[in-house]
Amino acid sequence: MSSSALRSRTLRRIAVPLAATAVALGVAAATATPAAASNSYNGNAYISGSDTPADDLNDEGAVNMSTNTVSSVTCFWQNILYLDGYLSKSGIDGSFGPATKTATAQWQGDRGLSADGSAGKATFTEAGIAFGSNWHWTENTSGGRYWVGYRPSHVPVESALEVTRPFDGGAWSFLNKRTGKWVTAAYNTNAC
């Protein structure tokens, strides 16, 4: 057998399995379901809700050092930590780093939660409870939207974290205390 025939036969032996693998991978990629939103509890890509905003945080996903680490939801959480005195204003950057983890653990411990430094379902639920009690939330339904003032008792009304969402349900937006800009509380992007 000539060297060119041997080479051709060897190439066919390699090419056929490679082609079959490429076809299989292409079919798998074409039929794969799209990636789920990063929010692990309700599948939404944003903090969202319907009806009264007081219970909107009860099913939110985690933000921590390994999940949704850089996101607008992390930025939202950092605004809460800032208002409660656990994080400096300069620490509001939408990136869940060591300072945010430490502040989160302190916030959790002061509220009798497991101080693991991860803002997950129990932590967001606790923050949501505070909307209706200690944090003096009020709602205004002007313009077809809820406008909620989120503030600890020691914070003046004019310094509250402003939060809004459509009256009939949808994504939350908040006024970032560091930048003064409105941000949609998204898990998959960081507009902090």
Stretches with model-predicted labels:
Residues 1-37:
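Secretory targeting and sorting signals
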Residues 2-8, 33-90, 141-167, 171-192:
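Acidic, Ser/Thr/Pro/Gly-enriched interdomain connector segments
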